[in-house]
């Protein structure tokens, strides 16, 4: 993988090392989050010959596009839509994916390099490098760096734990023993310990799922019966400091965090009706600082389009590279910002939201932290500039949907007869998908298919492209002719 850069070397540190210089470490990590190149607006790569094409002419790129990418695909956070962007970008540019043998890298176990299809550690440097690692895994930095170049761009996505809990309860009700025993999400959150048993089958879906996906250790009172899996798998992970541990809820569960920036004295700030004292827990603080040193950008599902604009900026990609359709969305389960703003919630909904955040207190800490990071980055990018780019992105997406899709939107799976575009149906909710319009040109048909293909089918397509089946000739056709 070559010599590690100073930044990537720092990524190998665990919070135990951070105890020596926590303040400096957090400052550096936060600074890394704020770095980014100028955003490039370019003409659409898909020539649909419609009015959605930008009137701005193509801009000459001022930086090379980043193509070594590590995306931690978190569960029920809009990550399938990001995965679709990566699939399409890598497919168009002939990039090499680090693919699992099936569809996940041994989840829920920690990621291991040996699970990457075609990975040969003893190849002596002759193996072509991987460009993109993006399928479901439980993050394990040391093993990831065995597979990916040290200059890779690391990013992920988080979602408000209250919204995530609603989606996870519906999707994983048959998988999680805790959810399966509960008659409703409200009943579960009213008394979660009556249903939840640490270490029970699938119960990592029922509490602090984001924290789990990031591969972070759990404080003693939250550890599973199997113990903290970091201990035996990774010698340099975050570790719980001796004599330290977070209180039961480090964040006020009644504080409905409102992430919209408020200008005060010329500075953008975050508003909250209650103080969110993350500093009260060194355990949480150290883990968040470690994540800051590892991840170059963390997207926020409730601000998905804003996040995509920042992603394009950070990667030096064109706007069209991040224009796409939503994938793996459940019927009636859209990305609604009302969950993070108490203004539109009923009393019952507020109570459910507060309980979900309190139960998933580590996820709530993650969400608050990376939400603030996102808005700090937006301030640096420029609010008016961002608003313009988001409006353009949405206009292009809408034009693509009208041009490519029957009805111009996602449809109930009962209308999807083409198996290439029918999303995998799991859980109690219906997963929506797409039907392509007829009469598309060959070029437009190809691009619209890329946009509409669900993640499992696209992974299979990439697998077949990267590992084409070998055809052996029958023995009789390979015989030499008689003299």
Swiss-Prot record:
SUPFAM superfamilies: P-loop containing nucleoside triphosphate hydrolases (SSF52540). The chain crosses the membrane at residues 19-39. GO terms for cellular component: Golgi cisterna membrane. Residues 225-248 are annotated as: Disordered. Residues 40-483 are lumenal. It is a single-pass type II membrane protein. Glycans are attached at residue 371. Belongs to the galactose-3-O-sulfotransferase family. Catalyzes the transfer of sulfate to beta-1,3-linked galactose residues in O-linked glycoproteins. Good substrates include asialofetuin, Gal-beta-1,3-GalNAc and Gal-beta-1,3 (GlcNAc-beta-1,6)GalNAc. Disulfide bonds: none annotated. This is Galactose-3-O-sulfotransferase 4. Its cofactor is Mn(2+). Pathway: Protein modification; carbohydrate sulfation. GO terms for biological process: glycolipid biosynthetic process. Its main location: Golgi. The gene is GAL3ST4. Its EC number is 2.8.2.-. Residues 1-18 are cytoplasmic.
């Amino acid at each position: 993988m070559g010599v590690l850069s100073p930044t990537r070397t720092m990524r190998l540190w665990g919070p135990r090392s951070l105890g020596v210089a926590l303040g400096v470490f957090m400052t550096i990590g936060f600074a890394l989050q704020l770095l980014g190149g100028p955003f490039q607006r370019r003409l659409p790569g898909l020539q649909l010959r419609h009015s959605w094409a930008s009137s701005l002419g193509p801009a000459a790129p001022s930086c090379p596009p980043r193509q070594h990418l590590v995306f931690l695909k978190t569960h029920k956070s809009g990550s399938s839509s990001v995965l679709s962007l990566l699939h399409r970008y890598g497919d168009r540019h002939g990039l090499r994916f680090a693919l699992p043998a099936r569809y996940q890298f041994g989840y829920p176990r920690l990621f291991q390099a040996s699970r990457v299809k075609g990975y040969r550690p003893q190849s002596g440097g002759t193996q072509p490098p991987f460009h993109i690692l993006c399928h479901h895994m439980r993050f394990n930095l040391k093993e990831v760096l065995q597979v990916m170049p040290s200059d890779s761009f690391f990013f992920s996505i988080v979602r408000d734990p209250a919204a995530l809990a609603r989606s996870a309860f519906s999707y994983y009700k048959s998988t999680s023993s805790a959810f399966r025993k509960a008659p409703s999400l409200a009943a579960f959150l009213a008394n979660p310990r009556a249903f939840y048993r640490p270490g029970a089958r699938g119960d990592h879906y029922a509490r602090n799922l984001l924290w789990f996906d990031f591969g972070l250790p759990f404080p003693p009172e939250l550890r599973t019966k199997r113990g903290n899996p970091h201990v035996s798998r990774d010698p340099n992970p975050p570790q719980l400091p001796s004599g330290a541990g977070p209180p039961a809820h480090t964040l006020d569960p009644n504080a409905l965090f409102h992430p919209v920036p408020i200008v005060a004295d010329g500075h953008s700030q975050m508003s909250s009706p209650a103080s969110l004292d993350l500093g009260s827990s060194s355990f949480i603080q150290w883990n968040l600082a470690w994540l800051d040193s590892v991840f170059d950008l963390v997207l926020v599902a409730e601000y998905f389009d804003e996040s995509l604009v920042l992603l394009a900026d950070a990667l030096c990609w064109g706007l069209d590279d991040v224009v796409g359709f939503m994938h793996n969305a459940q019927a009636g389960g859209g990305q609604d910002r009302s969950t993070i703003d108490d203004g539109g919630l009923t009393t019952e909904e507020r109570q459910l939201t507060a309980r979900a955040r309190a139960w998933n207190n580590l996820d709530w800490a993650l969400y608050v932290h990376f939400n603030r990071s996102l808005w700090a980055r937006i301030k640096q990018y420029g609010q008016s500039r961002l608003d313009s780019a988001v409006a353009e992105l949405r206009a292009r997406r809408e034009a693509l949907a009208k041009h490519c899709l029957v009805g111009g939107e996602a449809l109930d799976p009962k209308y999807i007869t083409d198996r290439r575009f029918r999303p995998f149906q799991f859980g109690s909710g219906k997963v929506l998908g797409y039907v392509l319009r007829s009469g598309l040109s060959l070029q437009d048909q190809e691009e619209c298919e890329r946009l509409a293909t669900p993640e499992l089918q696209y992974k299979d397509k990439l697998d077949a492209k990267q590992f084409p089946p070998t055809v052996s000739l029958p023995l009789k056709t390979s015989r030499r002719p008689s003299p």
